[in-house]
Each structure stands twice: as C-alpha cells, then as structure tokens.
C-alpha cells in the first residue's frame, strides 16, 4: 500500500506541476474563445449586412446599365431584334466583362469572414502581432475592442510562449539525458567531481548532496544540449507545416514554405492567405507552436552565447597568465611597477600581454563584451602589482608577529630562549621561530637578565 500511495502521490505532484506550467496557456485558450465570441457578435452581423447591401448596389447598377445600353441598341438596330433579345445579349456581355474584372456575385457561405472560427483566427493574429490584414474590424466598437484585446493578449501570449518553451526545453533535456545514458557517454567533468569528492572526504568536509548535484545538472543540461539539434527540430517543423498547407490550401511547396516562414517570423504580409476559414484554428495552432519553437531557439542561442563568453573569459585568463610570464621574462613588463602609480605603463604592459596571445585567443578577447574586457583589465592591474603588495604585506605581518612573540616571551620570563650572548658594545639579538624562520631584530626595550642588570636599546635590523 505504501508503494501505491507513493506512486499516486508522485503522479499527483507531476500533474500539479504540469498543470501549473500550462495554466497561462489554458487562460490564453479561454481568452481566445472569449475574444472570438465578442468579435463574432460585433463584426459578424455588420459584415453580413454590408455584403447584402453591396450585392443590391451591384444588381441595381447592372440593371440600370443594361437598360440604358438596351435603349441605345434598340435605337441603333431599328427594331432588327426584340428588346428582350437585346437585353439578354447586353446582360451577358456585361456579366462576362464583370467576371473578367474579378467582380463576382457575393457568396454568403464563402465571403463571410466574421464567423466564429474566423474570429478565433483574428484573435490569434492580434495577440501574436502577425496581423495578416484579411480580417479587420469595420465598426468603431470593434476597433476599440481590438485595442483593449491586444493590450491584454500580447503580454499573455509572451508568457504562454515562455511556458511552452520551458516545457519544450524540459523535453529536450529528457531526450538528451536518455541519449547520454543509452550511449554511455560520460560527462567530461565527472573526473573533476570525483576528485573534489575525494578531497572533501580527506579534509573532513561535507560532500555535495545528490539533490544539489541534480539541481546543478538540470540547470546545465539545456545549455549542454547541441543548439544544432534544436535548429534541426525547428526546420523539420517548418517543413511539416509547409507540406500540410499544400494539402489544405492546394498550394505548391514554395508558396506554402513562404507563408510558413512569413508567419513564424510574425512578418505577416497578407499576400498569401488561407482561403478556407474552417481550417483557420488549425493554422493558428500550428503558428503558435512554431512561434514557441522560434522563441525557444532564440533564447537558447542567447544563453549559448553567454555561456561561450564566460568560457572565453576563463580561457583568456589562463592564456593571459602564460603570456604575462613570458612578457616578464623578456623584460617587456616591469614586475615592480605599481599599476595605481603608473597606469599608463600598466596599459602598455597589458597590451604587450594581449599581443603575445595566439590569434584565436586574441580573437576571443576582442569578441568579449566591454564589461568583461574592463574586468580582465582590472585583473591585470591586480596581477601587475601583486608581487610588490605581497612582499610589503608579508614584511609587515612578519614584523608584527615577531614583536608579539617577543612580548609573550617577556611576559613569561622566557627571553633567555631567544637571546644570544653578545659583547657589551654589541646590540642584543633576539630570534623568533615564527613561521619556522629565525629573523633577528635588535631589542628596543630595557631587558633585565639573571646575570646582571643591563640595558639594551632595540631597533629593527
């Protein structure tokens, strides 16, 4: 029972996390249906009335035109044909002329755009910012509703695309881990982790917990996933959509591919459009998935560039250390120059070090952002002045420790352990074993010893 309960709990937890991740997408779907109903109610009847009115105007125009032409023909033919025959012939000529111009009678089944399915497609073109232009509001209220709908829908779409991209990224990481496991590919930093764990055990420190390692690996898995694989998936999806459109719209493959790419990049010229509005929701779903793929790929490319820049900085820093040593050996860099006192000389030294790097490392350096270049220059200043600062700090610290050691010996009456007998005219030398070194200094206080009262003046040697 415990195993069953644990399994049910795991399933519920997974479902809860998945539902939480899909919640913005569910809200977006509901928002789409709500917007479709609103625009359908606002624009649907208006469009129908406009089409009916246009058809009436066309019919009236044709009737008047035919009548006038008929009257003219009657007068010209001098009653060689009946009026009905002349009317029919003239109407036929005008109808042919009208069809040649592309003016055809309105089809209430095909020419209606503001159906519920068409309204869904319109909502998708609004909040994805594609905007083909084939469906537009014709009323003031419709335009006002479009503006409000876009203000809410566009941020919601961005959030939904982010959630879809995150789910897609998780799927990529699962496939990548499965690939590594099935091919028994060992991570390149496994040996480093083993060494670190061994060092931690030897030093008595706490090793990294499996949960911490799992969290770190989950964060790095997506960056380690080859970006070429994601690009390949995106290309496959684009080709799939293009092939699907060739069957839905009877387009050639070039036209379908053009429409797909124009849509996925949210350019949306509107010159190529689906003709069957019953398939509009399917087109919208395909475009939404394509946009999420494009968004994911662009985000991952940015993360890959940032990771590459970080790796470049580490490589350049190592190369800098090697080039700095070579420059110092050749005398191009002065070891004792304080960069704060002579920044101009430090700049020349830094340029000399950069010039000694190989062309690939030097190229990576020039590709770094300005902020990281400045950081590397600051590291250069620290390295250039590190030796003199280190020597200065060591001397001061050593002197302080020696004086503390002498004071302790004085308080414990153990000065005889550190003193060496000298003649009366020679200064008394005191030795300290601080840091396993014997550093002589002259006594600066008045010392009293068992063999007599003698005064000694001290000063540093």
Swiss-Prot record:
Residues 116-136, 253-273 dip into the membrane without crossing it. Changing residue 140 to E: In sa589; defects in locomotion. Its main location: membrane. The chain crosses the membrane at residues 22-42, 144-164, 225-245, 281-301. Glycans are attached at residue 88. Residues 1-21, 165-224, 302-461 are cytoplasmic. It is found in: Membrane. It holds the Pfam family Ion_trans_2. Residues 328-347 are annotated as: Disordered. GO terms for cellular component: membrane; plasma membrane. It is a multi-pass membrane protein. One of its GO terms (molecular function) is outward rectifier potassium channel activity. It comes from the Eukaryota. Disruption phenotype: Worms display uncoordinated movement and paralysis. Keywords: Glycoprotein, Ion channel, Ion transport, Membrane, Potassium, Potassium channel, Potassium transport, Transmembrane, Transmembrane helix, Transport. GO terms for biological process: locomotion; muscle contraction; potassium ion transmembrane transport; potassium ion transport. SUPFAM superfamilies: Voltage-gated potassium channels. Expressed in body wall muscle. Belongs to the two pore domain potassium channel (TC 1.A.1.8) family. Outwardly rectifying potassium channel protein; activity is sharply augmented by increase in temperature. This is TWiK family of potassium channels protein 18. The gene is twk-18.
